[in-house]
């Protein structure tokens, strides 16, 4: 019934097993990947026919984490998984980025990759198994895919690289880097680091690429055993006559367009050049494939013009040389009521970045598959269509926005103050108001300055820069601070963020084979040069963290005996609720007894702090207190007197007066202020009070 194949290999300290032929047999290719109890099923499906009018490669990648994988039932009213989490979306992008450039130009068949996490070892993240599984399933689907690829996570601690570190190991690692590539070349890097030197970062990329060869070898061996059916597809034969026609119609216009420095005017000129080609070569009767081919030839012509100019040493599209950063303008304190804000403009890319400070209660609660946790630092990136002069849908963030926000967040994490030194939660929002390349790096620069404007004591300034590459045979040019067109027409998108001391985030996407270690070294060195230039400008705008905004909450902390926490909270939360309402504060209580009071008003916070100190103060035996009668007990037993907020004691009828009394109510009423002396507390914490003892101790007049 089943024709099963499997392949096992050692991957660092983990054992990885690839299985196929038993599950999801109707998919074009499917693989079950196991890595030390983390199990991911990856299925690839390819449509046999191209949709009419299709003019791009429709690859979709979806990654899902099922809660049963961790032995959990989803929380909330609906007991099933809902929309994808941020972690799932980021993993979709990790899988997609190294796979997409390995498909040939002109392949327009629908390809769908679905990765499902079915079992999770909390120590082994499912992203690396999912990437390996997607590569293997793609090979088994028989599509024209120039793979397989391998993927590896690299950590760095005590001067040594760690292959596929566990979750526990990552807590002490100075680096969390994911690298993917083919047998001969690196294709994708995603990382965050603790201000590491460029040499260490490059070494991690090379180390990861060397180690992933074990995964690539296993996939190839599995494919040899399975011997998959090859998908029938052949690239369109080169039509030299059509190439010549497109060139004759548009080359001069395209070359002239790329001499225009302003983006909108340049885009308009390129649009007119395309319209000229379209009018001459495409009619209503033209087949979709031919129309697509003409469009791709026009795009190829654009690339050839730009690339040829740069490799010939001519100025770039906007007139710069290869190493120059675009002009930068910085304005701080832009938004009067925001806790921190900065307008960061670099050429035609602009980000308006704001920072909001909050309390522990404002932290993001993340219900992850491996367990719930909170995050005190949030960075959200918004890319409205007006930023590129276009109209479009506004709504929930797209995958690209989530990915760019995560990259900017990675860049800043390394310089954030420790929780014990700065108790605030922090939310940074980057509104991209103009875009012509490198908006995520503008978010890094603006985010750093916005945090400092809000008074967050960052340990260093962080700047980010996007690098590009043009590679033809043995000639190459590394471009500093790339434009949007240079990103699309180049061979590499290489984003580096860091401080003066080292790299905090690195993201790389390579569209071609053949990027060598030497080229990456040149790119890193040139990126450092650009980063230091930007850091100098940023420091001239804000050289150190500023004073907290008057609109930001003030945090006050005190520590109490953990046994007293219940007294501060009160029965059913009555005490803390009254405290927050009456003082206008927000109060957070940690299990270790650390209390954080947040308030815009210093007076309210001080009052809350005073009352908490009263509540948690130890009752002293023999001390006299001013108390309030809160209850007259039935059967003439006595009265309950409150001597501190939340602390009551019993005054027995025999302790009310020196003489014998018959009725408690004749001497005491609820709300009456009385002086009482603490006689004793029992093992259950109950307090015995005496009015007559307090009278006896009163000074004689």
Swiss-Prot record:
Domain KH: from-to ranges: 553-612
Catalytic activity: RNA(n+1) + phosphate = RNA(n) + a ribonucleoside 5'-diphosphate
Enzyme Commission number(s): 2.7.7.8
Signal sequence interval, chain numbering: none
Amino-acid positions noted as binding Mg(2+) in the UniProt annotation, renumbered to this chain: 487, 493
Entry's localization field: Cytoplasm
Domain of life: Bacteria
Ranges where the S1 motif domain occurs: 622-692
InterPro entries in UniProt: ExoRNase_PH_dom1, ExoRNase_PH_dom2, ExoRNase_PH_dom2_sf, KH_dom, KH_dom_type_1, KH_dom_type_1_sf, NA-bd_OB-fold, PNPase
Cofactor needs: Mg(2+)
Pfam families: KH_1, PNPase, RNase_PH, RNase_PH_C, S1
Keyword Cell cycle: no
Role, per record: Involved in mRNA degradation. Catalyzes the phosphorolysis of single-stranded polyribonucleotides processively in the 3'- to 5'-direction.
Protein name: Polyribonucleotide nucleotidyltransferase
Organism: Laribacter hongkongensis (strain HLHK9)
High-level lineage: Bacteria, Pseudomonadati, Pseudomonadota, Betaproteobacteria, Neisseriales
